[in-house]
Amino acid sequence: MRLTTALLLGTLPALAACGGPQPETEAPANPQDEFWAALSSHCGNAFEGGLVSEDETDADMAEAEMLIHVRTCDEDRITVPFHIKGPDGTWNRSRTWVFTRIGEGDEAGIRLKHDHRHEDGTSDDVTMYGGDTADQGTARRQSFPVDQESIDMFQREGLDASITNVWSVEVDAAEAGDNARYAYQLTRKQELGAPEDRNFRVEFDLTNAVEAPPAPWGF
């Protein structure tokens, strides 16, 4: 009887502990929020980089100097101009990557568009193409399959090879340390309907900011 009583008394504190308030658990981090914060952490800074992929199509860009400039940042829009130095020493400032937060709740995502301008600031016939994220991605990498608006534009302009495009962007936060990188990649896969595989990838060293370039054309 004493043993039974002791066992019962011994379990009461444990049961009482189980019935007490449980510590709150933190909600899992949203990868897209973390990606956005990482990109925003470089706002105002410019970085050098270059081509790292090896498609023959891009051979003329293999040694080209390249810069990105995380130029403007707010809660729902970030612009990143992409500058390429030509063989004649002049800079092509026609390209700006535009990231936008879209949707809410389960429908939330990130949109990537490519703003292409002529030197006089007017829009190129092929501009504002891109796509929206199809999943949460990771804190470091987000992918953007081509959207229908862009497919229609590519078909209208005779760029049928581009209708299976997938763009991906990788970024490390400013505090990531010695190996922090930004990467932009375009891929096409024959298995997904492309006429041939395509891989274009540029990378930029985020550990060493350089002087910011002039504004991209049209801005």
Language model regions located:
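Short, surface-exposed coil-to-beta transition loops
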Residues: 62-66, 91-96, 123-124, 164, ...
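N-terminal glycine/threonine-rich, aromatic-flanked beta-hairpin/loop signature
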Residues: 61-92
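Edge beta-strand at a domain terminus
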Residues: 125-132, 181-219
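Bacterial N-terminal signal peptides that target proteins for export
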Residues: 1-7
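An exposed acidic His-Trp-rich patch
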Residues: 100-158
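Bacterial signal peptide processing site
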Residues: 19-21
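C-terminal motif of bacterial Sec signal peptides marking the signal peptidase cleavage site
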Residues: 14-17
